Amino acid sequence: MGGLAQILKESGHEISGSDKQFYPPMSDHLKALDINTYEGYSIQDMPDADLYVIGNALSRGNECVEHILDNKLPYKSGPEMLGEVLEDREVIAVSGTHGKTSTAYMICHILISQGIDIGFLVGGISNMIDGSARLGNDKLFVIEADEYDSAFFDKRSKFIHYSPNTLVINNIEFDHADIFNDLDDIQRQFHHLVKIIPGNGNIVYFKDDKNTEDLLEKGSWSSLVPIGADETYQIDLSNKQIISSGDSYSLEGFVLFGSHNIKNITAAITATHINGIEIKDSISALKDFEGVKRRLEIKYKDSSTIIIDDFAHHPTAIKYAIDAVKDKFKNRSIMGFIELGSNTMIEGVHGDEVFKAAADLDESIWLDKKEVLKGRCKNSSDSETQCLDLIKDKIDHYDILLIMTNKNSKRLWEPIIEHIKGK
């Protein structure tokens, strides 16, 4: 919503907003944009407005929501409002269970490197691009398109409102158990999205993702741009290269590491290539791309210990992160600290898949506040303090600590770093 506020401000609207709390860097960013913010939800803080944009975190019973409904004031969801802003733009939307933020920022970085004044709205914070949103003056607009619901009054996925011209589908898996009952529920929302891609639009996807293949077999009416063996765009993970129309392009020497990032890079290069950017120019732009905060981000390094922070909160993402670290830091011992943070993880929906994903760690410690792992592994606790104490006792025996959570990770890595420095 903060990014949307910036885009609406840049569009010429007067903007103010309320939220439960505001934190840096977004609070500082909104202040710099001269956007008034109010902590908490109070009718007294609500100005007379032409339109009220309601975020999907709010529901019936909220004082401001009830005031809007009781007085028949005009309102829309955030995605619907953004969709109106995007009506005249050429939208590149990045969707899928994993890799949306990284891939979207890669596309932004490529286009900006070509001098294109794009618009964008991406979750997370890039290490190289200022801010997570910009209106821009060019026709092109890049957006991270997630499948979460739009608002309490519109349970369609957000991405339905964005009307993409180019859609990237990185992968599809079951997640967001608080919103979706099963994989079929998620597939249904993606099918609705596929149905609104124009006939002259493009869908970029990976042939090796069965769930995406199953989705597209239900029907597609746009140009399909598969990445896979014997296709126009191919990926060779073992040799770290992209092959397009018989030409090979090396991805060696990139700042980012891990097979999942090679796939993200390939998706970004493919999406920009079909929008007019030469592959060699995209590779040149991405070679020094430093990625996104909280994606395999090194928070501490000395001669004996490395601490890495990652946003992984799904078995597949956990395995991606572990595999990437093992490949980058060969023959190093790795201890993992995994917090069950997402609604799906907290409820234990993934079952034993979380253990399988973490099997290649030398040791794993689990922060499990609902105790769904109790009795199933030795190093799990509902106590954050107990987990941190355990890590402090063990960290000298390992080369790398890999922290994986979608919650505030600073509260986890900061005390460990202080412990190391204080020894």
Name these PLM-found stretches:
Residues 1-22, 31-37, 48, 52, ...:
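ATP-dependent carboxylate-amine ligase
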Residues 7-13, 31, 44-47, 56, ...:
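Phosphate-binding loop of NTP-binding sites
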Residues 20-23, 41-43, 56-60, 80, ...:
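Short, polar loop motifs at secondary-structure junctions
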Residues 38-41, 76-83, 121-124, 219-237, ...:
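Beta-strand->loop->alpha-helix junctions that form or flank phosphate-binding loops
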Residues 239-246:
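Short polybasic amphipathic segments
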